[in-house]
UniProtKB/Swiss-Prot annotation:
Organism the protein comes from: Aedes aegypti
UniProt family annotation: Belongs to the PDE6D/unc-119 family.
GO biological process, one term: sensory perception of light stimulus
Cell compartments where the protein resides: Nucleus; Cytoplasm
Classification via PANTHER family: RETINAL ROD RHODOPSIN-SENSITIVE CGMP 3',5'-CYCLIC PHOSPHODIESTERASE DELTA-SUBUNIT, RETINAL ROD RHODOPSIN-SENSITIVE CGMP 3',5'-CYCLIC PHOSPHODIESTERASE SUBUNIT DELTA
Major localization listed first in the record, in broad terms: nucleus
Pfam families in the cross-refs: GMP_PDE_delta
UniProt keyword Cytoplasm present: yes
Name recorded for this polypeptide: Probable cGMP 3',5'-cyclic phosphodiesterase subunit delta
């Protein structure tokens, strides 16, 4: 990354925050979990306590509400689901243009792995992390890690 990219990345990061996250059953729209926390902070490992029933859903609708001071040409995120540090799944989401000085809600649907590939919650509990990298085009804005606990 060049000097201009680093400066742009820092400028976007300073004015960027996650306001809240909601996970819903994609089929019924029922809220399964929500948290009013800035999960974009890169300096800590965040924790999320998610109801165990989320593992039984066919698909989950994720809503991210975020604010940005700076405009973004191509806001996107890459997510890696890791089990004990090894990648189990990887997803790529692209939102596109984001206007400056706005608050936005971004909804995405994530389909579950086939049941034959699912592990029991007691094995997953505390051993799964979701690593999310937020980008504007190819410029990394922030990378966060969330450890999952199933309740």
């Amino acid at each position: 990354m060049g000097t201009d990219d680093v400066a742009r990345s820092e400028k976007i990061r300073e004015g960027f925050q996650i306001n809240w996250l909601i996970l819903r059953d994609a089929d019924t729209g029922k809220i399964i979990w929500q948290e009013n926390k800035d999960f974009s902070c890169p300096d800590v490992e965040h924790e999320a306590r998610v109801p165990i029933k989320i593992l039984d859903l066919r698909a989950v609708s994720r809503e991210i509400n975020f604010s940005t001071v700076e405009s973004m040409e191509n806001f996107r995120l890459d997510q890696k689901v890791l089990f004990k540090g090894r990648i189990m799944e990887e997803w790529f989401f692209e939102m596109g243009w984001v206007s400056p000085n706005t608050t936005n809600t971004w909804q995405s649907t994530i389909e579950a792995a086939p049941e034959s590939q699912m592990m029991p919650a007691k094995v997953l509990n505390g051993n799964v992390t979701i690593e999310t990298s937020f980008f504007d085009g190819e410029t990394l804005i922030s990378k966060s890690v969330v450890r999952l606990y199933y309740t």
